[in-house]
């Protein structure tokens, strides 16, 4: 048996790097949630909440490219499977569902709500220097900053 990476420096995953994991099986735990059991290249198993990635159409007994999102102070590894359509740093066009305002702690931001390829609704903050008026029904070009829990985090292109 291989001990977890935080005890054994030869078998250590690094934050921000992408590795190929084996999707071994889907299990349902006592909390009623389905989890993917993923095995890293060093033979260590990790569990990943399935509901965030259901739309990816991942199947057991397949290889899945995952980025190590972060490793917390207890050594728990947080993985982000590679999105089948969006890649960080690329641009894509999204349909606008709604435009409006969101109040933050000490300010009010203009925001738009867009839909991604899987019909997830994603909020995008409009930068203050952006002067165009964006209406529902329009299409906007956004840059994918990163993927978090199966959804792209977007910024509006000027």
Question: PLM features: residue spans?
Answer:
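Single-stranded RNA-binding regions, centering on S1/OB-family and related RNA-binding modules
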Residues: 1-158
């Amino acid at each position: 048996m291989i001990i977890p990476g935080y005890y054994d420096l030869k078998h250590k995953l690094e934050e921000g790097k992408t590795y190929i994991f084996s999707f071994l099986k889907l299990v349902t735990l006592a909390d009623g949630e389905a989890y993917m059991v993923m095995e890293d290249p060093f033979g260590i198993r990790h569990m990943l909440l399935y509901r965030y990635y259901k739309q990816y159409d991942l199947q057991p007994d397949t290889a899945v490219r995952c980025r190590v999102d972060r490793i917390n102070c207890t050594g728990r590894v947080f993985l982000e499977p590679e999105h089948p359509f969006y890649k960080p740093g690329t641009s894509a066009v999204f349909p606008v569902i709604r435009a409006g305002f969101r109040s933050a702690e000490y300010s009010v931001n203009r925001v738009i709500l867009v839909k991604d390829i899987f019909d997830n609704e994603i909020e995008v903050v409009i930068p203050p220097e952006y002067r165009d008026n964006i209406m529902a029904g329009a299409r906007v070009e956004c840059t994918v900053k990163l993927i978090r829990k199966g959804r792209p985090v977007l910024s509006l292109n000027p």
